[in-house]
Amino acid sequence: MHSFYSHVKLGDNLYRERNGVDFEDLEPGMVFQHRPGRTVYQTENALHSLYTLNQAAIHYDACYAASTEFGKPLIVTTLTLSIVMAMSTKTFGRVCANLGMKEVRMPAPVFDGDTLYSESEVLEKRLSNSRPGNGVLTIHTRGLNQKGVTVCEYTRTLLLYLRGHEPYAAAAY
C-alpha cells in the first residue's frame, strides 16, 4: 500500500501543499478517485457552446431540446471531457506534457445539475527514451455522474518529470 502526502515540510511548523504524485510512486493497477466532484450547470454549458462555436441547438435551445429524445439540453461533450480531465490534474500534477489521448467515449449524456466525479487507473509506465529526466505514463480515466454511470472515458499518455528533474523548487512549489 502506497501512502501519498499532500504537503511537504519546509521547516518548523511550515508546510507547502504538494502538486501531484511522483512518477516513481505510480504503479500499473493503481486507481485514483479524483475529488472533489463538480456540478455542471446550463449557464456554463451555453457559454461553452458560444465560446467554442458549437452551434448544435441541443446544447442551448431548451425548446428544441425538449422535442428530442433527451427532453432537455445536453451538456457539450467537450465541456464534460474538460471537466473530467481537469479533475485528474491534482493527482497527475507533475506532468511535463500531454502526449496524446485515444479511445475517447461518451457512453451516456450529461445534463444540467449533474455532478461529475472521475477516477484514473495507471495502465503502464516507462522511462522516456528521448527525454532523460522524464517518464511516460498511460492512464485510463472515467468520468461518472452522481448515479455512478460512466459518462466519459479515455486513455491518455502523459510525460511526467522524474524526482529531481522538475522545475517546482525554482517556482516555490
Give the residues covered by each predicted segment:
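Hydrophobic beta-sheet segments that form the core/acyl-binding groove
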Residues: 101-145
